[in-house]
Amino acid sequence: MEEKTAARRLTRRNSLYEKHPNSVDSLGRAGYRFSTQVMLKFSRLSMGLTAGLLLAGLNTVSAAKNVDAADPKKVDADFKFQGEYAGSLGGQYDVGAQVIALGGGKFKMILYPGGLPGAGYEGEEKREYDGARDGDTVTFTGGTTGKSISGGKLTFERDGQSFSIDRTIRKSPTLSAKPPEGATVLFNGKSAKNFKPGKMTEDGLLMEGANSVAKFQSHKLHLEFRLPYEPTRRGQGRANSGCYLQARYEVQVLDSFGLAGKHNECGGIYSIKDPDLNMCFPPLQWQTYDIDFTAAKYDKDGKKTANARITVRHNGVLIHDNVELPKRTTASPLAEGPEPGFLHLQDHSNPLRFRNIWVVKK
């Protein structure tokens, strides 16, 4: 990592960050400054398991639906350790970490040079470490640097010196966005009448497995969703759903927090394109999709003359920019055609929750 690049990163201000209320910013007091040379050595510490092994370990599908997984009040002792951590190493170099709960006190940590995805990370090589919980501390193995989480802080120790970064809760800049004048409000927490089928929880959230009554051609969509906390599930069995534009083109919904970011993971256009960046937040944290969809065009005989196109922002970050959709995506309810289609929120045997859904026709 070059010093100029590091300096630029240090000046960045990420508007998504909100410090965890129990975290303590000890970086300024540590007085420990890492040189570029030391940081290069740090970035080349033991890699732990590879991304391929991580994906292999997270690819088992479990079918039974656990409704309690959608309830933030019914989490296990591991939940408070899962999440994002971000800060500066010795006041010079930004770093981010995503900690994934795997059940039974086991964890995976992904370490990002430069900061978290969408907040400083620019595609450099990531590092992965396995961790285990003992009481109120999670300790990670691998490399010559000690790594542990306690009290809302991720601490690194090496050669008798240490530094810490804080647990960070990010919020999408479009979270709770109000529908503009003229928008079609599909769900505002008062009733599920605009969806057939459509079910609402007692606390006013839309459940998975919903089809909008209204149908649309070209439009802009704002949608907020929350993944359930399912640490023992893996791959496509972990918080799986989908947001289908016109019931034809799916933007995948999945707990792929910390994973590579593939077409069948959160933000992916299923079977067509990976997201440019994996912006998936941790389970039980509200997320946003802001989608600009242009419907396919057909002539008077029903022959397609132009493919549909889509632009997607996930948690405020552009992940698809005017992408052409040459076909309908896998498992879409409707075939391609000139007719308008409905918004389909897939039921894939996981308890997803949705809120604040509205559409602006183009």
Predicted features by range, described:
Residues 18, 39-44:
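Positively charged n-region of N-terminal signal peptides that target proteins for export
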Residues 13, 18, 25-26, 32-35:
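Short, positively charged and aromatic/hydrophobic N-terminal segments
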Residues 67-90, 95-98:
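N-terminal secretory signal peptides
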Residues 59-63:
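Sec/Tat signal peptide C-region and signal peptidase I cleavage site
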Residues 46-57:
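Bacterial N-terminal signal peptides
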Residues 2-8:
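Extreme N-terminal basic, low-complexity initiation segments
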Residues 64-68, 77, 93, 102-106, ...:
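Carbohydrate-interacting regions of secretory-pathway proteins
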